[in-house]
Protein backbone atom coordinates (compact mmCIF):
# COMPACT_ATOMS: atom_id res chain seq x y z
CA UNK A 1 0.00 0.00 0.00
CA UNK A 2 1.36 3.36 -1.02
CA UNK A 3 0.90 6.51 1.00
CA UNK A 4 -0.82 9.01 -1.27
CA UNK A 5 -1.83 12.61 -0.97
CA UNK A 6 -5.18 11.64 0.56
CA UNK A 7 -3.39 10.23 3.61
CA UNK A 8 -1.41 13.43 4.10
CA UNK A 9 -4.54 15.55 3.73
CA UNK A 10 -6.41 13.38 6.22
CA UNK A 11 -3.66 13.76 8.83
CA UNK A 12 -3.52 17.48 8.11
CA UNK A 13 -7.29 17.83 8.54
CA UNK A 14 -7.12 15.98 11.86
CA UNK A 15 -4.31 18.25 13.09
CA UNK A 16 -6.19 21.35 11.96
CA UNK A 17 -9.37 20.20 13.70
CA UNK A 18 -7.48 19.48 16.92
CA UNK A 19 -5.95 22.95 16.80
CA UNK A 20 -9.29 24.66 16.25
CA UNK A 21 -10.93 22.64 19.03
CA UNK A 22 -8.00 23.49 21.31
CA UNK A 23 -8.61 27.19 20.75
CA UNK A 24 -12.38 27.04 21.20
CA UNK A 25 -12.53 24.60 24.10
CA UNK A 26 -9.78 26.16 26.23
CA UNK A 27 -10.08 29.92 26.09
CA UNK A 28 -8.68 30.45 29.59
CA UNK A 29 -5.05 29.40 29.12
CA UNK A 30 -2.83 31.42 26.80
CA UNK A 31 -0.20 28.67 26.50
CA UNK A 32 -2.77 26.16 25.22
CA UNK A 33 -3.99 28.74 22.71
CA UNK A 34 -0.41 29.27 21.46
CA UNK A 35 0.12 25.52 21.17
CA UNK A 36 -3.14 25.17 19.24
CA UNK A 37 -2.06 27.89 16.82
CA UNK A 38 1.23 26.05 16.29
CA UNK A 39 -0.74 22.86 15.58
CA UNK A 40 -2.79 24.70 12.96
CA UNK A 41 0.38 26.03 11.34
CA UNK A 42 1.82 22.51 11.33
CA UNK A 43 -1.22 21.22 9.46
CA UNK A 44 -0.90 24.01 6.90
CA UNK A 45 2.77 23.13 6.42
CA UNK A 46 1.85 19.49 5.91
CA UNK A 47 -0.57 20.58 3.17
CA UNK A 48 2.15 22.64 1.50
CA UNK A 49 4.61 19.76 1.54
CA UNK A 50 2.03 17.19 0.37
CA UNK A 51 0.90 19.25 -2.60
CA UNK A 52 4.46 20.24 -3.42
CA UNK A 53 5.51 16.60 -3.44
CA UNK A 54 2.50 15.60 -5.53
CA UNK A 55 3.13 18.30 -8.13
CA UNK A 56 6.91 17.88 -8.17
CA UNK A 57 7.47 21.53 -7.32
CA UNK A 58 9.83 22.76 -4.61
CA UNK A 59 8.06 26.07 -3.98
CA UNK A 60 5.65 24.57 -1.44
CA UNK A 61 8.47 22.99 0.53
CA UNK A 62 10.45 26.23 0.59
CA UNK A 63 7.35 28.12 1.71
CA UNK A 64 6.78 25.52 4.44
CA UNK A 65 10.31 26.18 5.74
CA UNK A 66 9.57 29.90 5.72
CA UNK A 67 6.34 29.34 7.67
CA UNK A 68 8.21 27.14 10.19
CA UNK A 69 10.75 29.92 10.72
CA UNK A 70 8.06 32.54 11.29
CA UNK A 71 6.13 30.17 13.60
CA UNK A 72 9.24 29.53 15.69
CA UNK A 73 9.85 33.26 16.04
CA UNK A 74 6.19 33.81 16.92
CA UNK A 75 6.30 31.11 19.59
CA UNK A 76 9.53 32.45 21.09
CA UNK A 77 8.23 36.02 21.27
CA UNK A 78 4.85 34.90 22.60
CA UNK A 79 6.40 32.78 25.34
CA UNK A 80 8.80 35.58 26.28
CA UNK A 81 5.89 38.00 26.62
CA UNK A 82 4.02 35.45 28.75
CA UNK A 83 7.01 34.95 31.06
CA UNK A 84 7.33 38.70 31.64
CA UNK A 85 3.57 39.04 32.10
CA UNK A 86 3.55 36.19 34.64
CA UNK A 87 6.40 37.80 36.59
CA UNK A 88 4.54 41.11 36.74
CA UNK A 89 0.96 39.92 37.31
CA UNK A 90 1.31 36.40 38.72
CA UNK A 91 -1.19 34.97 36.24
CA UNK A 92 -1.38 34.17 32.54
CA UNK A 93 -5.15 33.90 32.30
CA UNK A 94 -6.70 35.39 29.18
CA UNK A 95 -8.88 37.69 31.28
CA UNK A 96 -5.78 39.32 32.76
CA UNK A 97 -4.05 39.92 29.42
CA UNK A 98 -6.38 42.78 28.48
CA UNK A 99 -4.91 44.95 31.26
CA UNK A 100 -1.56 45.21 29.47
CA UNK A 101 -0.49 48.77 28.78
CA UNK A 102 1.74 49.84 25.90
Curated annotation (Swiss-Prot):
- EC number(s) from the headed UniProt entry: 7.1.1.-
Q: Example GO molecular function term?
A: NADH:ubiquinone reductase (non-electrogenic) activity
Q: Which reaction does it catalyse?
A: a quinone + NADH + 5 H(+)(in) = a quinol + NAD(+) + 4 H(+)(out)
Its keywords, alphabetically, are: Cell inner membrane, Cell membrane, Membrane, NAD, Quinone, Translocase, Transmembrane, Transmembrane helix, Transport, Ubiquinone
Compartment list: Cell inner membrane
Tell me the superkingdom of the source. Bacteria
The protein's matches in Gene3D superfamilies, at most eight in alphabetical order, are given as: 1.10.287.3510
Q: How does it sit in the membrane?
A: Multi-pass membrane protein
Cellular component per GO, a single term? plasma membrane
Top-level class of the enzyme under EC nomenclature: translocase
Q: Does the keyword Cell inner membrane apply?
A: yes
Output one GO BP term.
ATP synthesis coupled electron transport
Its job: NDH-1 shuttles electrons from NADH, via FMN and iron-sulfur (Fe-S) centers, to quinones in the respiratory chain. The immediate electron acceptor for the enzyme in this species is believed to be ubiquinone. Couples the redox reaction to proton translocation (for every two electrons transferred, four hydrogen ions are translocated across the cytoplasmic membrane), and thus conserves the redox energy in a proton gradient.
Q: Subunit structure, briefly? A: NDH-1 is composed of 14 different subunits. Subunits NuoA, H, J, K, L, M, N constitute the membrane sector of the complex.
Return the protein name.
Answer: NADH-quinone oxidoreductase subunit K
Name of the gene: nuoK
